[in-house]
């Protein structure tokens, strides 16, 4: 396990990937320090900041000022907020703006925003000039603990599903400023918390038990919040280092995502109905229930997972999604397009208990369809 180091209120998680190793800094005040941190690590002195119309009024000026003070000249691109921004149209816009800004390989693209902005910006950084440097400044809990770490980037296919078009492009630095989480809505913070809980459910049962006892302190802020984010980043870093390209165990990070992504596709990525973390929450409960159905785990584990997620205010049932859902057969079509499908065989992340997740190959489609029909509202 890679050690978490701490300087004052800031914790550092190091991701040792050889020449592509990088640090994740977690703590307050990091946007104000961004220029100094970037200048000390990267040679280039130009940057293209990619952000959205929700985040820009809150943090763009502070980031630009920090870069300017460090001698880094920046150009800014402000995009619409929301999952639908992860499209070819906006990817082309970002690539054009990065090229217009004369960003070269030693310069950087900076993603200032949540998972959508990070995924889109990272994809652009990975393909412009065949790869420029990339810095993540995640502004949501979900992006701080998940999408900003590990190098997965991409956009959605409007016809086939979520995150199906993209590249692996590791960041050079992640600055997780915990102060920005104070401006999130309760719904956004809860959605991000689903990914925090996921790490305990994958292979850290003690962390899940700690969350059951301390989740209120994580929501309130302070040291418990920083500790939870650092532990989550460390958990993801460990998996990424062991399996960077998702050839095996990295797929564990998709616990709850096979069902969750299908539900997101079924709602046409309409955030008024369902956001990613809510889909993951429902998906994790479904994964534990399906595991129990397949006699792999105790039904008590599924009930425990649902109890905790419901306690923090997350949805745990498909019936809680606003509006009508398509029939189970349509959900199965989305599942069949999942990135983990190999040679046409369904692959799920299932569990033998809390913190005992595993990659299950060749899951019978008939069993999944029957299960979805049973759970469909």
Swiss-Prot record:
The keyword 4Fe-4S does not apply. It comes from the Bacteria. One of its GO terms (cellular component) is cytoplasm. One of its GO terms (biological process) is amino acid biosynthetic process. Keywords: Amino-acid biosynthesis, Aromatic amino acid biosynthesis, Cobalt, Cytoplasm, Lyase, Metal-binding, NAD, Nucleotide-binding, Zinc. Binds 1 divalent metal cation per subunit. Can use either Co(2+) or Zn(2+). Zn(2+) binds at residues 195, 257, 276. One of its GO terms (molecular function) is 3-dehydroquinate synthase activity. Gene3D superfamilies: 3.40.50.1970, Dehydroquinate synthase-like - alpha domain (1.20.1090.10). NAD(+) binds at residues 115-119, 139-140, 152, 162. Signal peptide: none annotated. It is found in: Cytoplasm. Belongs to the sugar phosphate cyclases superfamily. Dehydroquinate synthase family. Catalyzes the conversion of 3-deoxy-D-arabino-heptulosonate 7-phosphate (DAHP) to dehydroquinate (DHQ). This is 3-dehydroquinate synthase.
